[in-house]
Every structure is written in structure tokens, then in C-alpha cells.
Amino acid sequence: CHQIRDYTKNKQKQTDDYPYGGGCGMVLYAQPIADCLRAVQAQCAAQGRARPHVVFLTAAGRPYNEEKARELAGYDAVTLVCGHYEGIDQRVIDAFGDEEISIGDYVLTGGELASLVVADSVLRLQPGVLAEEKGYQDESYWDGLLEYPQFTRPEVWEGRAVPPVLLTGDHKKIDEWRGAQSRERTRERRPDLYDAWCESHPLTELPKWKRGENMRLVKNDEQLKPVSYTHLTLPT
């Protein structure tokens, strides 16, 4: 962790000033951020490491998701620059930044919490952090869908029973049930993700259930695609 204030060149250790053009809030200086990033780059070079991938955490950045976490996990080093106040002088972002990232459509008082979110989501993908690689491959967003519901003991809790299929020991049926639950949960809660998943899996054969019909594939404009993204009736 590097304190930007340590790189200021004024006696007051001031890191911000009023924005050109007027407006509320204060804007972080370019100079201390630039000098801090140069120091980080020099440190990496001295260690024989590649230049860090520089990410500025701003509300105006591109939305953060699991795909981006996997991309960042592939870099040798990543530097996260936390925004604050009204923002950061755009010139230092243009000069040093590889990208700007936002963790959601809301505003925080600073980028520190956002940096922790990014760091945690990236570090957990590193070898040895989780006991098994499968530990994150079955989770929400890994394959573009939300994760299926989870259950543990007791079998019945306050009159609510675990779905019978999970007690059968039939791994094929369990996988089919979980896949259907994952698709249905995504369709209901995140139709944007569901539509994207259907577009990327146009030939996916969905299992038939005891009640209702599964999504069928039809030929339309010489492309196979789902008839619709309507409700999938699931087994109990």
C-alpha cells in the first residue's frame, strides 16, 4: 500500500485542489499520483518484474465482473489507484492508466472499498488460495450464470425440506437439477446475463422435466436459437 500524500511536493502535504471550470468537491493532483506510480514501476523493475497493469477505480469506469477478475488474475502485477473526493485529474489517468473500473452503479466516498473488492476477487483465483480450483468454477458468474441454491443439514428445517433430488446420490440428475436451477435463477434475477448466456449457447439441449416443457431449438434465419426465454418449469 502506498500513501499518495508521501509524494506531494508542498509543505502542507496537500493532494487536491478545486476543479478547473468550477463545481463542487476537490480533485486529486496528477503529480503525486504520477510520482507514486513511477516509484512502484521502479520497484517492480528492480525486482525483475514486468510493469504493473494500472487500474484506476472510478465511478466512470467500465463495469467490473468475474470475466475482468479472471483477466486481472493473469497479470504478473496489478496496481489499483483509489479515487477520492470529486475525482482524479484526468491527465494522470490518460498518462498512466491501462483502464478505469467501476464496481457498480453507485458512488462511494473513496476507492478504497472498491480496491478491496477487486483485490479479493482476483486473489481468490490465484493457485493455492482455495483448496480446489472447482471451488470457484461452480460459483455465480463463472460460466455466465448465477449459482444454483445450496442446502446442508438438517434434511428438514422448520418444515422446509431439502429438494429430494439432492438426496438420491444420482450425480447426473443432481447436475441436471442444478443446471436448471442456475438457468432459472439467472432468467428471473438477471435477464441480461441470461440473454447473453443463451446467445453464447445456441445449441444447448435442456433436459425435459416431469412438468412443463423445456426450451426447444428451431431453425430461424438459418440459425438455431431458443424459441424464447420464457419460464422453465422445474422438478420439485
Functional labels for PLM-detected ranges:
Residues C1-Y7:
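A short beta-strand-loop structural module common to alpha/beta enzyme folds
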Residues H2, V55, V78-T79, E99-I101:
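Hydrophobic/aromatic beta-strand patches that form the interior of the parallel beta-sheet core
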Residues T15-C36:
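Short, structured active-site "lid" loops
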Residues Y29-H84:
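S-adenosyl-L-methionine/SAH cofactor-binding core of RNA-modifying enzymes
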Residues I88, V92-E139:
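Structured adenosyl-cofactor binding patch, chiefly the S-adenosyl-L-methionine
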Residues L125-P164:
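Internal, active-site/partner-interface "lid" segment
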Residues P154-S228:
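SAM-dependent methyltransferases
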Residues T230-T236:
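Conserved small/polar residues in nucleotide/adenosyl-binding loops
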